[in-house]
Regions:
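Gly/Pro/Ser/Thr-rich low-complexity, intrinsically disordered segments predominantly at protein N-termini
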Residues: 1-184
Length: 184
């Protein structure tokens, strides 16, 4: 006798359900994940720093934009909300419909496993060219680049300038600017 299977008892919500919920949620393979409590001040400041750095970096690229907290509807059972994304040629105005060029997630204790494992896998499968995971407690960020369908770690960055030059709108991020105000 094999191990019991419980998949049939798990909830299986859809985007239509998701739209009706109050508060902040993500929906991954039909399972809801609460995005509460709201992010701490340092989390929001670091996300804002990425938003600014990336906006400055792509300012001359008219078909790309940098946004935060916008839903990405992958299919009817998966809708996620990255912290910061670089979008190019996005036709929809209510949610993201195609893979962003760059995604930034700022880690918190409550989202670490989801950002480092589940979303890492989703972003890799969806062919997001760059995934940045920022760690406020360590004042560093891991930068991953999609190479032959798999993420290759480009480094743990703290003070460096990283150039994203093989995407539609090249950009750079000065990681010293991202973390400077938090250094003692």
């Amino acid at each position: 006798m094999g191990a019991p299977r419980f998949e049939e008892y798990l909830p299986n919500y859809t985007y239509d359900d998701y739209k009706l919920w109050g508060g902040d949620w993500e929906l991954i393979d039909g399972i809801p994940y609460a995005m509460s409590p709201s992010p701490m001040k340092d989390h929001q400041l670091i996300a804002s720093n990425f938003l600014f750095e990336l906006r400055v970096g792509i300012k001359d690229c008219s078909n790309c934009m940098v946004v935060s907290e916008l839903d990405w509807k992958l299919n009817d059972s998966t809708t996620i909300r990255p912290d910061v994304v670089v979008l190019c040629d996005e036709p929809h105005d209510k949610y993201i419909t195609k893979a962003p060029q760059i995604i930034v997630e700022v880690i918190s204790k409550s989202t670490a496993m989801r950002d480092e494992k589940i979303k890492f896998q989703i972003y890799q499968e969806e062919k997001v060219p760059y995934y940045i995971i920022a760690y406020p407690d360590d004042l560093r960020a891991k930068v991953y680049k999609l190479v032959d369908g798999k993420y290759d770690k480009q480094g743990d960055l703290t003070h460096e300038v990283f150039q994203f030059d093989d995407i539609e709108c090249s950009a750079s991020v000065d990681f010293d600017n991202i973390f400077k105000r938090f250094r003692k």
